[in-house]
C-alpha cells in the first residue's frame, strides 16, 4: 500500500481565490473587508465585493492609461502626480467623478486666458 505521506500534493489542490476566479488584480477580500468595516450596510451580498473590485480596477486602468498618454505627451518616462491630475482634469466624466478630490503634489490645472494669448486666433465669425 502506498501511504498518503509519499504522495504529498499529488491529489491536493490549492484553493482558488475570488480574485483569481474573477480574473481581477484587485483583492476581492480586501474590498469586502473595507465594505464591512465601513458599515455601509447591515448585510453584504456575496458578489458585491467582486463587482466593486472590478469597477475599481477598471477605473484605475483608465486613469493610468490617460496619465501615461499625458506623460508621453510631455516626453517623460515616469508617471508623476502632476500627470495623473492633468489626465483626470482634462477628461469630463472622470473629472466629474473626482470633483472633490485633491491630488497631493500635483499643482494646479493651467488656464490661459484668451486675452493673454500671444498668438492671434481667428474667430469663427471672421472666417465667413
Swiss-Prot record:
Chief localization: nucleus
Record-linked InterPro entries: Histone-fold, Histone_H2A, Histone_H2A/H2B/H3, Histone_H2A_C
Keyword Nucleus found: yes
Keyword list, A-Z: Chromosome, DNA-binding, Nucleosome core, Nucleus
Pfam name, any one: Histone
DNA-binding among keywords: yes
Cell compartments where the protein resides: Nucleus; Chromosome
Gene Ontology CC entries for this record: nucleosome; nucleus
CDD domains hit by this protein: HFD_H2A
Sequence similarity: Belongs to the histone H2A family.
Subunit structure: The nucleosome is a histone octamer containing two molecules each of H2A, H2B, H3 and H4 assembled in one H3-H4 heterotetramer and two H2A-H2B heterodimers. The octamer wraps approximately 147 bp of DNA.
Record's protein name: Histone H2A.2
Species this protein is from: Lilium longiflorum
